[in-house]
Amino acid sequence: MSGVLTASGPSWIAPFTGLSPRQFSKLITASRREGADPVRKGRPWSLPLEDRVLLVAAYWQTNLTLRQLAPLFGVSKSAADRVIDHLGPALALQTRRRFRKNAVLIVDGTLVPIRAHTVAAQSKNYRYSTNHQVVIDADSCLAVAVGRPLPGNRNGCEAWELSGAKDAVGHTTVIADGGYRGTGLVIPHRRERGRAELPAWKEEHNTSHRKVRARAEHAFARMKTWKILRDCHFKGDGAHHAMLGIARLHNLTLAG
């Protein structure tokens, strides 16, 4: 059974990973160092690590079913499933533990439509979704933390606390939108009751705040080009692993 897609053909790398061949090579080297390609007991993998990483990225990028995707790599559906189960978690973004002095982070939530109703709930878009809290660095726009998914009907305040995103950033300054009221994060000023408009200095603060916060929205827009985040059919931790892996690939793309 011969496949069509392989990482040995550089032309396949960018469409499915968003990375240049050089960036992809860095990812493979880092993955090996992190233990993503251990010596297995029993039957060895039928694909080299490079092709397995490409398979996982292609799955996230295209959202093809495994029956559709597996033949493109010359493997069975069950083999492709094992590759994704093994490598999905191994490609995850590692939460940053320390931040530079005076760092400013941005948090926002995004809803990922998901078919596994055991981990989802109907949200404002009337679809079953999970709420993912993503934290990015305001200067570099790199993702630094991704919270565990919660049912999509949880608001930003709850999700910030319960997803683990709050614990991941410690006491670092974090800005957010008005949905995070009462969390201690830096949010926009609101009009006081009985006042028609905000003082000029508060309006200026809000304008600046909005421009910085837009960087998170742009990061989400780039991440949502991965089709798995528009209609996810993973069960269990699959959606979380996909979000973490896509965040890592997003960072590699930006870092150059």
Predicted feature residues:
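Short, amphipathic alpha-helical "recognition" segments used to contact nucleic acids or chromatin
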Residues: P48-T62
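Non-catalytic, well-ordered alpha-helical scaffold segments
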Residues: S25, V53, H240-M243
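Glycine/charged-rich beta-loop-alpha catalytic/anionic-binding loops adjacent to active sites
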Residues: D37-P38, D51, W201-E203
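Short, well-ordered secondary-structure "scaffold" segments embedded in the functional core
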Residues: Q68, L72-G256
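Charged, often Cys/His-bearing segments associated with DNA-binding zinc-finger transcription factors
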Residues: M1-G42
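A cross-family signal for key residues in well-ordered alpha-helices
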Residues: I28, V56-A57, E161
